[in-house]
Amino acid sequence: MELPEPELIRQSWREVSRSPLEHGTVLFARLFDLEPDLLPLFQYNCRQFSSPEDCLSSPEFLDHIRKVMLVIDAAVTNVEDLSSLEEYLAGLGRKHRAVGVKLSSFSTVGESLLYMLEKCLGPAFTPATRAAWSQLYGAVVQAMSRGWGGE
C-alpha cells in the first residue's frame, strides 16, 4: 500500500486541529445530511434524537465527535506507520459493527470528512491535498473493515 503524502496531511490537519469540535460538528452535520438513516444509531441513555440538530447539541454526542477527531489525529500522527494502528482500528470496526453501522456507511463518512476539510481549508484544500486525505482515509477504513470480518 502506498502511503499518503504525509506533509500535505500534517499541514492541513494543523489548521483543522485548532478547532476540532467545531470542524467535527461540520463533518457530522454533513454526514446526517447525506445519510439521515444513521441518526437512530446514536442513542445515549436510551434517548432517541429527534433531529440532527438535537443530536449535534447533545453533550454525549459532542464527546463522540471529540473521540472521532482524536482517531483522525492519531492517523495523522502515524501517517507514515499506519500499521501501528491496525489492531486499534480493527477494534473500532468491531465496535461500530456491534452498534449497527454498515461498512458501506464509511464511504459517506469519507465524503463528509472531505467536505469538512474543504470548508475548513478553503483554497488551501488543493486536489493534491484531497487525494492525500482520500488515500489516508481509505487506509483507515481498510484497517477498520477487518473488524467486520472478525479478524
From Swiss-Prot:
Heme b binds at H64, H96. Phosphorylated during hypoxia by ERK1/ERK2. Phosphorylation regulates the heme pocket hexacoordination preventing the association of His-64 with the heme metal center. Thereby, promotes the access of dioxygen and nitrite to the heme and stimulates the nitrite reductase activity. Phosphorylation during hypoxia is stabilized by 14-3-3 proteins. Its EC number is 1.7.-.-. InterPro entries: Globin, Globin-like_OT, Globin-like_sf, Globin/Proto. It is found in: Cytoplasm, Cytosol; Mitochondrion matrix. It holds the Pfam family Globin. GO terms for molecular function: GDP-dissociation inhibitor activity; heme binding; metal ion binding; nitrite reductase activity; oxygen binding; oxygen carrier activity. Its main location: cytoplasm. GO terms for cellular component: cytosol; mitochondrial matrix. It catalyses: Fe(III)-heme b-[protein] + nitric oxide + H2O = Fe(II)-heme b-[protein] + nitrite + 2 H(+). Gene3D superfamilies: Globins. Keywords: Cytoplasm, Disulfide bond, Heme, Iron, Metal-binding, Mitochondrion, Oxidoreductase. It is an enzyme of class 1 (oxidoreductase). It comes from the Eukaryota. Residues 1-149 form the Globin domain. The keyword ATP-binding does not apply. Monomer. Homodimer and homotetramer; disulfide-linked. Mainly monomeric but also detected as part of homodimers and homotetramers. Interacts with 14-3-3 proteins; regulates the phosphorylation of NGB. Could interact (ferrous form) with G-alpha(i) proteins (GTP-bound form). Belongs to the globin family. This is Neuroglobin. It comes from Bos taurus (Bovine). The gene is NGB.
